[in-house]
Amino acid sequence: MRPNPRPRTGKSVPPVLDLPPPFRLVTLREVGDAFLHAQQVAAEEGAGTLVYVGRFDLAEFAVVLEPDEPLRVARKAFYAGMNALFDALLAHAPPEKPIAIDWPDAIRVDGGLVGGGRLAWPKDTAEDAVPGWLVFGGMIRTVSMTDEAGLHPLETALDEEGFEEHGASALVESFARHLMAAIDSWQQDGFGELTKDYLKRLSPEKGARRELGENGDLVVRWAATDQTDRRPLVDALETPSWYDAKRGGPRR
């Protein structure tokens, strides 16, 4: 990402995050949409812009990236974002707390859905053209808003799972640091290590050997039948599996 030390914040909310360079903070009120706003300002504000929404119940943020590869390859930056989000959760999780990714975008803690990641790019960009920007958006349910335990058995929140009580801001700060490490690894060592890290974090599928194609597709080889399935990343990103558009947050 292109470094730029200029601080930028929303008009109504002061900076609340301690971010490493080259990140620049834009803060929105609780009713804001970090993912949408980051797309709207990406071309003007550029790489390193991190949009954060101050919410009590969610860690909601989005970051602008500027790739130098064609879209079909650059889209794999999504996996760097997912690894960084996973690592941020791991850093604040209780010991031995199970965390897993449902390919490609949903994150579960001890089997319960807490949120996930999204990726956007200029829709008029051809697959073999370099996109002007990418936006990775993340959203994690930090606090449960229901008092009825067991009402939604397939979802959970960080407060219910014993996570450290540092709140959404600490999680996003941790994400930023881990994302920088992931991008540095990609630039220096190629995508291989990021691939390994991501694949080992996927929820298990019995009898499946999984790998990522050059364009980010998930390739699944079944030991029992010698059959191979290919799951296109671009199709999966079209409709995030974890996101409830009506609620504006993770599914229940």
Task: State each model region's role.
Residues 1-95, 113-114, 120, 212-216, ...:
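N-terminal lobe of the biotin/lipoate ligase/transferase fold
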Residues 63-76, 154-168:
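Short histidine-centered catalytic/ligand-binding loop motif
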Residues 93-129, 138-139:
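Acidic (Asp/Glu) carboxylate-rich active-site/surface patches
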Residues 107, 216-225:
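Short polybasic amphipathic segments
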Residues 122, 135-137, 141, 179, ...:
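Non-catalytic alpha-helical scaffolds and adjoining flexible linkers that form interface surfaces
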Residues 128-161:
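Short, acidic (Asp/Glu-rich) active-site segment that either coordinates a divalent metal cofactor
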Residues 163-216:
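Conserved, helical-rich catalytic subdomain that frames metal- and/or nucleotide-binding sites
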Residues 228-232:
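Membrane-proximal amphipathic alpha-helices
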